[in-house]
């Protein structure tokens, strides 16, 4: 799968990539977790998922409702009974270089309010490449074994797990309830012996030890599992009736005392330097190990700190998997293409002589932006020793977690004599409009707006995407077809299709892939989407910098479309209350706010939106409600120094109780929680009559929740 460069990725291209990534990762998840027959390598899966996350971080408003970053594993197979995990079996965030590890440590320190000199210990352990398994013991007896599944619901493989020698049936001196979690794997020697037996029997060979282990554990006949040489490493736990220890290391040692195999390469480390040193030691031993590993896992050692750090939607904040590096390859740069995205960004893509990198044939790679091609970074500093990139060059291609292959270097010794410097286009290759680069922006953008066919089509594709209007039967291919034929040029046209072509349905049903039934189904599907929540409408508009999360926040803030539209028009005056009110929304900064009022302030854009809304029944946004919470649906601002929790912890706690945390005080603020040094926010709250609490008052308000 080929992708455009990330740094120069347009919103149009980003949305298209996210759609492709969602489909690919969904198929890969099912193949890997449910069918035990991977269709891509683990490294490629990590790379695709990281690429997906990178696009979402750059274009948060493009995040899909079914985003792969919010998913763990795959749905359990119908062949096994289901097990609901009392504590979810989550995945791990990934680190791919030393900078990622340092960032991980700094994020933890910031969240906990720890200075750089305060002690912070971690454990490091090899990341076993196998199948995750949860074992439940009650009164020392194994009563249930379940795969991870989708993280919330797994498969009951109890009888199969009983056949694995490393999994004890009975344990002593353990908590009354104990869930042991770890990895089922197969050693290299056992894998080779198993495949030899398979070959002798004329049976299908396994591709690798991980596939063999997963396929063996998930047999419907436990006798087959028993015939396979499976092993188990314990490294974590789920539900406990009593703690195993105060630290990760103590708990692992306790699991070992119960008779479980734990990895002898697990070490305690202090700080990123020791973590990286241990990473290098494990990497050096990787080739000599008799089992597969694909990285090193770092975890905060102190379990109280783990609890304070908590979890994101699919990963713990207190752990990360440091993956082993990707591969490099050299090949010829045969051309440079320019792709135009939904927001007009011009993205250069290297067309390469196909080369295998990390087990995947690569023919396209990112060139980021015009500065990168010229040998500079976004700040104008020299990179690659100032070497520019030219068509005909022999270039180094790098694949890592960013999924999109990158052109990393140039071999000047092999540069053709007739190679000329690349001149980045000053006009859009799709519509011919000027392509301008604003100060501080790394990307050159087409100024054509909706007259640019590339932008118009990508905006329409975004409009019908799953996280937006999600109209059955109207996907990217149909949008391209209808736009080309002049049937749809703006979103409102979608909702007048029946009026314009319903009586002449023959025009649609005679097309390839269409019949009378499918045509009528499309019209019905469009009508079904006339009623739409405000948040989805805002997201569907495809406003630059406004993703799903921001759309939800904005919708909750203004409640109705009329209020939103009027406020955005009023916010054109940046000295007025409407502008300040927009900025008071947590997560809405100056750049995003400017983008919103620009989109709503242009006469042509607003007219197009009004034509759309005239076809719809836009549902008001409802405030978040949390039963029993005195702050549900309230707006809270934190200021000053908090002594009993960090700002990040306070924000996370408030949001978990249904509150909306804003960054500034306004007339819509319900509570100001002020510590020492509150300053201007406390003064403004007093002027507006906003209820002000100190930290103890806030904790008393939410006590017991």
Curated annotation (Swiss-Prot):
Q: Which reaction does it catalyse?
A: NAD(+) + (deoxyribonucleotide)n-3'-hydroxyl + 5'-phospho-(deoxyribonucleotide)m = (deoxyribonucleotide)n+m + AMP + beta-nicotinamide D-nucleotide
Q: Which organism is it from?
A: Roseobacter denitrificans (strain ATCC 33942 / OCh 114) (Erythrobacter sp. (strain OCh 114))
Locate the active site. 127 (n6-amp-lysine intermediate)
Please report any disulfide bonds recorded for this protein chain, giving both cysteine positions: none
Give the coiled coil ranges: none
The protein here is known as DNA ligase
The record's Gene Ontology biological-process terms are:
DNA repair; DNA replication
Has UniProt tagged this entry with the keyword Secreted? no
**GO molecular function ontology, one term from the record:** DNA ligase (NAD+) activity
């Amino acid at each position: 799968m080929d992708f455009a460069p990330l740094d120069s990725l347009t919103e149009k291209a980003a949305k298209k990539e996210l759609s492709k990534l969602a489909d690919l990762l969904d198929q890969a998840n099912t193949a890997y977790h449910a069918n035990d027959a991977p269709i891509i390598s683990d490294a490629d899966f990590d790379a695709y998922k990281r690429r997906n996350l990178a696009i979402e971080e750059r274009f948060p408003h493009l995040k899909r409702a079914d985003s792969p970053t919010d998913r763990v594993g795959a749905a359990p197979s119908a062949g096994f009974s289901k097990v609901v995990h009392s504590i979810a079996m989550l995945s791990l965030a990934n680190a791919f270089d030393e900078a990622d590890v340092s960032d991980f440590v700094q994020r933890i320190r910031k969240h906990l309010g720890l200075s750089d000199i305060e002690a912070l210990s971690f454990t490091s352990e090899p990341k076993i490449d196998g199948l995750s398994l949860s074992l439940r013991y009650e009164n020392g007896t194994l009563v249930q074994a379940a795969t991870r599944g989708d993280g919330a619901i797994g498969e009951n493989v109890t009888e199969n797990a009983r056949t694995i020698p490393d999994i004890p049936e009975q344990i002593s001196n353990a908590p009354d309830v104990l869930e042991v979690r770890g990895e089922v794997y197969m050693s290299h020697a056992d894998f080779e012996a198993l495949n030899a037996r398979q070959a002798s029997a004329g049976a299908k060979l396994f591709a690798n030890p991980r596939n063999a282990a997963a396929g063996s554990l998930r047999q419907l006949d436990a006798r087959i599992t028993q015939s396979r040489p499976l092993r188990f490493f314990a490294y974590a736990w789920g539900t406990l009736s009593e703690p195993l220890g105060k630290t990760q290391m103590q708990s692992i040692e306790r699991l070992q005392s119960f008779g479980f195999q734990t990895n002898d390469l697990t070490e305690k480390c202090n700080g990123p330097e020791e973590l990286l040193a241990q990473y290098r030691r494990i990497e050096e031993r990787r080739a000599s190990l008799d089992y597969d590993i694909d990285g090193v896992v770092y975890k905060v050692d102190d379990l109280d700190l783990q609890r304070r750090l908590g979890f994101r939607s699919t990963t713990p904040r207190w752990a990360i998997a440091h993956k082993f590096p990707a591969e490099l390859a050299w090949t010829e740069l045969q051309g440079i293409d320019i792709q135009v995205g939904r927001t007009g960004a011009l993205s250069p893509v290297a067309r390469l002589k196909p080369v295998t990198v990390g087990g995947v044939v690569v023919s396209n790679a990112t060139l980021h932006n015009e500065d990168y091609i010229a040998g500079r970074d976004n700040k104008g500093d020299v990179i690659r020793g100032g070497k520019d990139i030219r068509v005909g060059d022999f270039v180094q291609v790098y694949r890592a977690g960013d999924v999109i292959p990158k052109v990393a270097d140039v071999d000047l010794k092999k540069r053709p004599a007739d190679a000329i410097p690349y001149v980045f286009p000053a006009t859009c290759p799709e519509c011919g409009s000027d392509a301008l680069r604003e100060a501080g922006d790394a990307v050159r953008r087409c100024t054509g707006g909706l007259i640019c066919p590339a932008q118009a089509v990508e905006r329409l594709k975004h409009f019908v995407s799953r996280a937006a209007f999600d109209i059955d039967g109207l996907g990217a291919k149909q949008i391209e077809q209808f736009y080309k034929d002049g049937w749809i040029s703006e979103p409102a046209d979608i909702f007048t299709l029946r009026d314009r072509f319903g009586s002449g349905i023959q025009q649609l049903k005679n097309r390839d892939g269409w019949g009378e039934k499918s045509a009528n189904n499309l019209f019905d599907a469009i009508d079904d989407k006339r009623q739409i929540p405000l948040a989805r409408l805002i997201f569907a508009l495809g406003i630059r910098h406004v993703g799903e999360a921001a759309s939800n926040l904005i919708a909750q803030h203004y409640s109705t479309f009329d209020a939103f539209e009027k406020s955005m028009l009023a916010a054109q005056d940046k000295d007025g209350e409407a502008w300040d009110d927009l900025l008071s929304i947590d997560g809405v900064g100056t750049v995003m706010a400017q983008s919103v009022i620009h989109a709503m302030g242009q006469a042509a854009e607003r007219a197009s939106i009004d034509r759309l809304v005239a076809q719809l029944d836009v549902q008001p946004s409802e405030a978040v409600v949390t039963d029993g919470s005195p702050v549900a649906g309230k707006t809270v601002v934190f200021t000053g120094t908090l002594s009993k929790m960090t700002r990040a912890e306070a924000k996370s706690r408030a949001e978990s109780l249904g509150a909306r945390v804003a960054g500034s005080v306004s007339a819509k603020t319900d509570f100001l929680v002020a510590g020492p040094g509150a300053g201007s926010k406390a003064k403004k709250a007093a002027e507006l009559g906003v209820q002000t609490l100190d930290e103890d008052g806030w904790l008393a308000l939410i006590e017991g929740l």
